Regions:
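Short, flexible helix-loop junctions that flank or precede catalytic/ligand sites
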Residues: 1-313
Length: 313
């Protein structure tokens, strides 16, 4: 019964293309939610006893310590379903009562439709004019990794491509994909140094998380390699400011930074490009124009367009 419920929840998340499943302990029960775009949807309630068994099942298949219920843990696995597997990442932490919360990130590696205000992916490919650093920014689950891999397939299909990720989210047969493992010294910094010895035409670095990663990404870009990476920021200008906070100098940014693509998921609207202009000249008006176009085309409701415009003004 436990496995049947677990499979049902993962299958539902996959079918709905949810980014995350949340298992949250409340006062008298557990509640399960899923996130699709910016919307968090209630799924179902479970008794404590049932959900404790379900969480233990997920922890076991992900190689986590089933007996540890208070300290935070991370895990990942390919979860088997009837028609294949779903790659998932897990994060747990216990509350003050000893009940665990669980978040499952579903890694969708299938090809997704990307709708842009310009003429689709080939047009964006033309903007990859020179070697250096290209950054993809936006909220969690907005499709940054999907876009990076789509561009890699479109622009570097017959070239040497390597990726460094934590974990590998989209499996590609035509690139060498490396996965972080701090326990055996496979850190971002060490793997970037190793990757440069392979002389890749494109190096995909999953995420700029801290000063160490930021410095390593800049060093890789300075060698003349084309580098793709993601970063969390609230705007294109916010990307620039975030890099400065992480210790990257303005002079280094002027040398290596070739472009920034900001994106976020709009309910009903697909993945929409925010800006491909020079990061120092970006204006939020471009985003507002796109919101108007999406509403006029019927992809999103007018109220949603107005709400998104308010966010970015």
């Amino acid at each position: 019964m436990v496995q049947e419920i677990a499979k049902k929840l993962i299958r539902m998340g996959k079918n709905e293309e949810a980014q995350d499943l949340y298992f949250i302990p409340r006062k008298e029960e557990y509640q399960v939610f899923m996130r699709v775009g910016d919307e968090r949807r209630f799924v179902q309630s479970f008794p404590f006893e049932d959900m404790t068994a379900i969480i233990s099942h997920f922890k076991f298949v992900a190689g986590m310590n089933v007996g540890e219920k208070r300290r935070s843990q991370l895990g990942s696995c390919d979860y088997p379903l009837e028609n294949g597997v779903v790659s998932i990442r897990l994060s747990t932490v216990g509350d003050y009562r000893g009940y665990e919360s669980l978040v499952i990130r579903l890694l969708h590696d299938e090809e997704r439709e990307l709708r842009f205000w310009f003429d689709q992916l080939p047009e964006l490919k033309k903007k990859l004019a020179g070697r250096g650093l290209y950054l993809f920014a936006g909220p969690v689950g907005s499709g940054k990794t999907t876009l990076m891999h789509a561009l890699a397939q479109e622009r570097f299909a017959d070239q040497q491509v390597m990726s460094i990720e934590d974990p590998v989210e989209i499996k590609q047969d035509n690139m060498l994909q490396l996965q972080l493992n701090d326990q055996i010294g496979m850190t971002y910094d060490n793997l970037i140094k190793l990757s440069l010895r392979h002389r890749p035409d494109l190096l995909i670095i999953g995420e700029i998380r801290d000063k160490e990663t930021a410095r390593a990404v800049v060093r890789a870009s300075l060698t003349g390699v084309t580098v793709f990476s993601t970063i969390h920021a609230k705007s294109v200008r916010g990307v620039y400011e975030r890099l400065l906070e992480l210790g990257v100098s303005e002079e280094e940014l002027k040398i290596v930074l070739q472009g920034i693509c900001y994106q976020r998921l709009i309910a009903g609207g697909g993945v929409v490009d925010f800006a491909t202009e020079n990061y120092q000249e970006h204006s939020a008006s471009r985003w507002n124009q796109q919101m108007d176009l999406l509403a006029q085309s019927g992809y999103i409701q007018l109220a949603q367009a107005q709400a998104e415009k308010i966010i970015y003004n």
